[in-house]
Structures are given as structure tokens and as C-alpha cells.
């Protein structure tokens, strides 16, 4: 056990409420019953908490990342929509994703030969490995998984035409992850992809974080020929969430529901909880208010740009408390 990790104590097991702001004006709370583990790594604060609703959940710098009960709401559309669109991914890169859930879903493809997990913080992997087996499901023991500890941007920049699929499974765009949300980094991802390769990432919420969502899409569209945003409600995130798939040629809108279901069956993916041929197109079918949002001018994000006006960092919100009446 790391000296910076503390085990549960009687005081940490008392019922509590974790409050997470989504904007300066809105947030949500989640009841927690036990602090299972906690570390202050060199780059961030990591917690594993027990919750009645979601089971074990991971928080990083005050933001919920994943949980045992609802991880599929995030991991399945993030991985399988682009993978099925590609058709036969064999080499994949995950930037971030230290909980192992994305790697597990990629490794489910029988033709997958290699998955590289580039994670900045070894403590995230260690804590997930110990406390979240229902999320990673043994992915860290798969011989096809290759761990790279360190700067994911630097690693990606040294790759060229190596990967069929890249998944940016990142924390929110503040703190150590900020440099992974720029047009410059997306250019590095494009160079790292093979022809026909696919990229996916989450792009925040169209409801409470629409300015950053619009700018992220503008950044992607300046680099890739095909960019398709899609939507999924993630219970642990407290709101409607957005993701995007980008490629030079592969287009998720080109496949029928029948073709998608056939590819899922061919890969033995018959037990998914969310993603299917039917939900594929539902995810991509944006409501009018989102289409309007994305039709408005937005500026790409470049290295050195300040995102202070978007005000995403919950650490800047001050001490929040839940007031019960």
C-alpha cells in the first residue's frame, strides 16, 4: 500500500454525500457509505467509495469517473460504436482509461492483437486493479494489454500509422488532462492511426457544458474528414453526456442496424447491455437543440489556449455542501 493511501477508518465509514458541480449553477449529489481507499498521487486525488446505488465508484479530483453498476453506459458506446464502424480493429491505443473498462471492451474482439494503455498515473491503475474488478474484469492480466506509464500525448506523438482505433478515455479538460483536448493533439492522433482508423472520445455535456463541447467538435472537424457526435445519458455523471467518433473515411452513419448486429454477432458480442444495431443509430440521432448548438460558430482549441471562461474545474467552485430541508 502506498504511504499516501489510507485504509478505511471508522470515521470514514459514516454515511456521507458526495457533491459534484457540473457548472457554477448546477450539480448533483450521491450518497456514499464508505471510503474504501484514497490516494494523493503526484498529479491528482483518487478515491474509491462505496455507494448504495452504483456499488464501488472511483472519483478523481472530486469528479466521479466510473462505477461498478453503470460503467457500461460509458464504455460500450465509447468503444463499440467506433470499433464496429471500423469493422476489424486489431491494434488499439487507449489514452487514459486507467480503470481498465475501455481496455476490457477492446480486448473482447477476437481479432484484437494488441491494446496499449497509456496512463499518466500509475496510482489510478493500482487502485482500479484492487478495488474495481467488476469494471476491468481481468483486462490487466490479458497478455495482449501493454501498459505505458507516462505522458499519453508524448507517447501518441511518437507513433505513426500504428493503430486501427484510438480511445481518449480522459478526465475532464482541466488539470493534467488539458493538453489532450487540443487540435494539436488530435493531429498527433490522426498521424498515429492507420488509414481507415477511428478515434473516439467524450466531449462533455450539451446541457451544462455546451461551450466546451462546441469547441472540441470544432477542433476535431479541423483535423478529421468525418466527425460524428453522439449522445448518451450516463447516470453517474448526472446529465446527458456527449461523445464523438472521428476518422478520415469510416462513417458510423453508413451502416445499417442489420449490418451492425451481424458484426456484433461475428465478434461474439451478444451480451452487451446498451450498444446494438438499434441503439447505434439512436445514439447518433441528435435532437434539434443539439443540432442548433453545433451549427453555431466555435473556435478550435490550441495549445496554450485558456479555458478559464468555461469554468469546468470543480476545485474552483469552493467548498460545497448539501442542505437538507
UniProtKB/Swiss-Prot annotation:
Organism in which the protein naturally occurs: Nitrosomonas europaea (strain ATCC 19718 / CIP 103999 / KCTC 2705 / NBRC 14298)
Q: What catalytic reaction does the record list?
A: S-adenosyl 3-(methylsulfanyl)propylamine + putrescine = S-methyl-5'-thioadenosine + spermidine + H(+)
Q: Which GO terms describe its biological process?
A: spermidine biosynthetic process
Task performed by this protein = Catalyzes the irreversible transfer of a propylamine group from the amino donor S-adenosylmethioninamine (decarboxy-AdoMet) to putrescine (1,4-diaminobutane) to yield spermidine.
Broad class of enzyme this protein falls into? transferase
The record's principal subcellular location, in a coarse class, is: cytoplasm
Q: Active-site positions, per UniProt?
A: 169
Q: In which pathway does it act?
A: Amine and polyamine biosynthesis; spermidine biosynthesis; spermidine from putrescine: step 1/1
Q: What is this protein called?
A: Polyamine aminopropyltransferase
Residues that, per the record, bind spermidine: 75, 99
Encoding gene per record: speE
Q: Which of UniProt's keywords are assigned here? A: Cytoplasm, Polyamine biosynthesis, Spermidine biosynthesis, Transferase
The cellular component terms of Gene Ontology attached to this UniProt record, alphabetical and capped at eight, are: cytoplasm
Amino acid at each position: 500500500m502506498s504511504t499516501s493511501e489510507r485504509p478505511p477508518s471508522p470515521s470514514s465509514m459514516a454515511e456521507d454525500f458526495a457533491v459534484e458541480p457540473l457548472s457554477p449553477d448546477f450539480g448533483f449529489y450521491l450518497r456514499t457509505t464508505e471510503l474504501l481507499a484514497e490516494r494523493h498521487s503526484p498529479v491528482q486525488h483518487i478515491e474509491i467509495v462505496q455507494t448504495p446505488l452504483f456499488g464501488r465508484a472511483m472519483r478523481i479530483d472530486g469528479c466521479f469517473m466510473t462505477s461498478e453498476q453503470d460503467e457500461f453506459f460509458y464504455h460500450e458506446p465509447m468503444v463499440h460504436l467506433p470499433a464496429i464502424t471500423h469493422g476489424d480493429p486489431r491494434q488499439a491505443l487507449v489514452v487514459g482509461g486507467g480503470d481498465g473498462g475501455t481496455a476490457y471492451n477492446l480486448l473482447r474482439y477476437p481479432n484484437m492483437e494488441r491494446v496499449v494503455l497509456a496512463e499518466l498515473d500509475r496510482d489510478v491503475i493500482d487502485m482500479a486493479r484492487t478495488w474495481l474488478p467488476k469494471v476491468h474484469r481481468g483486462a490487466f492480466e490479458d497478455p495482449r494489454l501493454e501498459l505505458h506509464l507516462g505522458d499519453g500525448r508524448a507517447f501518441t506523438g511518437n507513433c505513426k500509422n500504428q493503430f486501427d482505433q484510438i480511445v481518449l478515455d480522459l478526465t475532464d479538460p482541466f488539470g493534467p488532462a488539458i493538453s489532450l483536448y487540443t487540435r494539436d493533439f488530435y493531429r498527433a492522433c490522426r498521424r498515429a492511426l492507420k488509414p481507415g482508423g477511428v478515434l473516439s472520445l467524450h466531449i462533455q455535456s450539451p446541457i451544462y457544458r455546451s461551450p466546451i463541447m462546441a469547441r472540441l467538435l470544432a477542433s476535431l472537424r479541423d483535423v478529421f474528414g468525418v466527425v460524428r457526435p453522439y449522445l448518451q445519458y450516463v447516470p453517474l455523471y448526472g446529465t446527458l453526456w456527449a461523445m464523438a467518433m472521428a476518422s478520415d473515411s469510416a462513417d458510423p452513419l453508413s451502416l445499417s442496424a442489420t449490418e451492425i448486429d451481424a458484426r456484433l454477432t461475428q465478434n461474439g458480442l451478444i451480451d452487451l447491455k446498451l450498444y446494438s444495431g438499434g441503439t447505434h443509430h439512436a445514439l447518433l440521432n441528435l435532437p434539434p437543440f443539439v443540432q442548433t448548438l453545433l451549427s453555431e460558430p466555435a473556435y478550435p482549441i490550441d495549445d496554450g489556449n485558456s479555458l478559464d471562461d468555461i469554468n469546468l474545474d470543480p476545485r474552483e467552485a469552493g467548498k460545497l455542501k448539501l442542505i437538507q430541508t
